[in-house]
Amino acid sequence: MGIPVGKSMLVLLISLAFALCCIAAYRPSETLCGGELVDTLQFVCSDRGFYFSRPSSRANRRSRGIVEECCFRSCDLALLETYCATPAKSERDVSTSQAVLPDDFPRYPVGKFFKFDTWRQSAGRLRRGLPALLRARRGRMLAKELEAFREAKRHRPLIVLPPKDPAHGGASSEMSSNHQ
């Protein structure tokens, strides 16, 4: 005859929920905040430098800064590159100006967060698109706890013996020998 309306609606809702989960898995979103955002911007923009707000030519009346876009919303490599500064001089001009600097000129990192490994990790995550659960610190902790729980469950003994109670366990054999 036909499938009842209630069952068909249930199947439709389940398949819709499954489809939404699959779509969310294929669209990874990366959020970067604080030092990790600065490190990633320094890595992506390298010697060009970067802005925390977009240049005035692209800005509208209510433009969001990179912190609002990357820390509170999803952030990808293309968005980060829009905040890179354009080089002021051509490559030829830069090479001649560097020759003027003395050799003992101090070349310190500009910025508090100068960790190349952190740059590579953040930019690598942006390129790879790891699941959001593994990217978040809280998610990594939950994953470790889950793995520890599974490991403990795997090594659980088959039979748990009760602890010996002196009133019942050890004393009963002595008392029975005294009564005989």
Curated annotation (Swiss-Prot):
Annotated site location: Important for interaction with integrin: R48, R58, R61, R62
Organism of derivation: Rattus norvegicus (Rat)
Physiological role: The insulin-like growth factors possess growth-promoting activity. Major fetal growth hormone in mammals. Plays a key role in regulating fetoplacental development. IGF2 is influenced by placental lactogen. Also involved in tissue differentiation. In adults, involved in glucose metabolism in adipose tissue, skeletal muscle and liver. Acts as a ligand for integrin which is required for IGF2 signaling. Positively regulates myogenic transcription factor MYOD1 function by facilitating the recruitment of transcriptional coactivators, thereby controlling muscle terminal differentiation.
This protein's name: Insulin-like growth factor 2
Post-translational modification: Proteolytically processed by PCSK4, proIGF2 is cleaved at Arg-128 and Arg-92 to generate big-IGF2 and mature IGF2.
Subcellular localization(s) per the UniProt record: Secreted
Gene Ontology molecular function terms on file: growth factor activity; hormone activity; insulin receptor binding; insulin-like growth factor receptor binding; integrin binding; protein serine/threonine kinase activator activity; receptor ligand activity; transmembrane receptor protein tyrosine kinase activator activity
Miscellaneous comment text of the record: The IGF2 locus is imprinted. Paternal inherited gene is expressed, while the maternal inherited gene is imprinted, hence silenced.
Organismal lineage: Eukaryota, Metazoa, Chordata, Craniata, Vertebrata
